[in-house]
Amino acid sequence: MAMIKNIFLVTLLFSFGIELYAERPASDQADEDKFGNKHDWCAEVNYDHTLIIVDTTEKFNENQYELLQNQILNNSSIAKLPPYDRISILDLTGRNITATQTKPVFSKCRPRSGEKSSQYKLDQPSFWNPKEKMQQAYNFFNQDLAKARTHFDELGELSGEFSMIMELIKEISRVDGLNFTDGSGYKNRKLIIFSDLIQNSENLSIFTSCKKGKCITWDSVKDAPKIKALMPAFKSDNKPEVLVYYLQCKYNKNLNNGMRDFWTGYFTDAGMKVTFDTETACLESKKNT
């Protein structure tokens, strides 16, 4: 059952790239960017962009950490994206840094892999596009991705004072440098949030109510001016779709405190389609013996 769950999760995380993928022409700009330091291995055309927010304000238990590393940020999961799609990873730390100051841990386009067995024709080598050249760029890409995973390895017991989830979503909707705004030119955008969803900032905190077993409702706060000011700036008809991988075990083990209803209300009012997935099982962290 765990394997079935993992396959489902990977499919859910990166499915739009497969479903909406149409055969793309080869890009000299991307293919000649050997180290990815000129154009991030991106083509002249902006295709799709998947942005992952990893909320590390509450330290992970071992099971959550393994899920992040082995199912979401691993090489094979990212390989599900079509060539030339951009993948970005943001760390929401809450540690002496505001949402505005948050920069990507990783943001590159997925180069062609050189794999004959790939479902994407662009990945498959040819006389004009030899396997060795493709795999060289792809290996450099995976090395950069490994550095991003190492970033989360090094967090240890750190936890943050604030959890500015809404603030960060607002920032990615309006900051051009994150390549996720309506004006970024990407045909499709997907936002993945890996979090316990405990919004906790000066603008809005749901920590106390949710911890007591019943979260405040979205309707009770949404009309406040400072909450309206936090709403995402996405205005186009083709807004990003959202997948929330909800780490419910610590504060909402039975999924009955209204947390998902709160965030469903938020995303609905933002005009964004949201899907939730949850932890498979709430297990205690392993202790050293």
Regions found by a protein language model. Name each.
Residues 198-255:
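VWA/integrin I-like adhesion module and closely mimicked acidic/polar interface patches used
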Residues 4-15:
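Sec-dependent N-terminal signal peptides
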Residues 243-244, 249-289:
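A cross-kingdom marker for long, charged
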